[in-house]
Each structure stands twice: as C-alpha cells, then as structure tokens.
C-alpha cells in the first residue's frame, strides 16, 4: 500500500498485521482536523497485490512510479502556435534567467498537512496585520499557479506542472467550498 503524497498530506498511517492491512487517512488520536462545510479532501492510495517473492526494490519502484507518474507533454511550440495564451515564448532562452525562474518556483513557500498542502501563508499580508493577528492564507490566488502554468507551457519542465496540479487540487478540495 502506498498513500499518494502521504508526508505532504499528514496525518496518514498504514498498518499491517496478521488481521490485514489498514490505511488510515485520518488516524485516531491525532487531534482535531476541522473541516468547513463543503470541503471534500480527496485522498489517493494504491494497493499493489504481489507475490511474496517480489523483491523489495521492485515494490519500492511501483510506489515511486505511483507517487510520480508519467505526465503528458505538449511541446512549447504547440502552445505558441495555438495562440491561446500571451506570448511568453522567447526566440532564444537565457540559461541563467531560466535557472533563476526555476529556483524561484522551487523556493516558493509551502505549507504541509491535509488541509494546507498546496497553499501557503502570505507573509506580506500577515505582517501587515490583515489577518488580525492570525496568518493570512494566500489560497494560491492566481499568481503562483498561473506562473507555473505559463512556465510549463513555455518550457515543458515537469516540476511546473506538478506545482500547478498540487495548487489546483488544493483549490478544488479546500478553497472552493
């Protein structure tokens, strides 16, 4: 059994014993998880039935493939020719600039946990006091996910699509309720 992004979506637990296997998406005794009306947190897990002779590395490989599956790829030229977005497609790429954009996306703050994975606290708004002493959640309001979508279209780099999917799933499960 492997739970998709279990660490990012904690608390999670998997238990195996002589009576069977249990996947605990919200384990007992973890404290309160408060969900508002309309929230519907999607959780995915894979059960892989295999022979006892299967090697551990093969089982691990199945889990890794499940955690990071193949994704479809559309070449940046196809996006550009389609004309469905602003022209973010340079004639010549500058490696230093591209690396800095990737580093900015990779360094974007992230919050973890079942209700927070895919979101982040907006430190600027929080410091300004807009939350009345409480953190102000960005709820991925447009900028970061939109930038990731454009970056995926213009480069085809998978990490941008992965970041976008995590944000979109958070929107669907938590923010749009």
Can you say where each PLM-predicted feature lies in the sequence?
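Catalytic cores of extracellular degradative/oxidative enzymes
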Residues: 1-177
